[in-house]
């Protein structure tokens, strides 16, 4: 179970890093927001889901 938590945290850190770099680049590029809006919202939804799933799995370990 601890390995599952570690993998979830690794995914969360990876996705967070991608979003921290990607979102400002998309917002700074002219015309890119309209093209990438769905991708940014999908990434934010995945990030939120990962936070919730990680917290639920972590609560089962205690």
UniProtKB/Swiss-Prot annotation:
Gene: psbZ
Gene3D superfamilies: Photosystem II PsbZ, reaction centre (1.10.287.740)
A Pfam family this chain is assigned to: Ycf9
InterPro entries, per the entry: PSII_PsbZ, PSII_PsbZ_sf
Protein name from the UniProt record: Photosystem II reaction center protein Z
Subcellular location: Plastid, Chloroplast thylakoid membrane
Keywords: Chloroplast, Membrane, Photosynthesis, Photosystem II, Plastid, Reaction center, Thylakoid, Transmembrane, Transmembrane helix
HAMAP family: PSII_PsbZ
Protein role: May control the interaction of photosystem II (PSII) cores with the light-harvesting antenna, regulates electron flow through the 2 photosystem reaction centers. PSII is a light-driven water plastoquinone oxidoreductase, using light energy to abstract electrons from H(2)O, generating a proton gradient subsequently used for ATP formation.
Transmembrane segments: 8-28, 41-61
Species, as recorded: Porphyra purpurea
Family: Belongs to the PsbZ family.
GO terms under biological process: photosynthesis; photosystem II stabilization
Topology of the protein relative to the lipid bilayer: Multi-pass membrane protein
Example of a GO cellular component annotation carried by this entry: chloroplast thylakoid membrane
Assembly and binders: PSII is composed of 1 copy each of membrane proteins PsbA, PsbB, PsbC, PsbD, PsbE, PsbF, PsbH, PsbI, PsbJ, PsbK, PsbL, PsbM, PsbT, PsbX, PsbY, PsbZ, Psb30/Ycf12, at least 3 peripheral proteins of the oxygen-evolving complex and a large number of cofactors. It forms dimeric complexes.
Presence of the UniProt keyword Cell membrane in the record: no
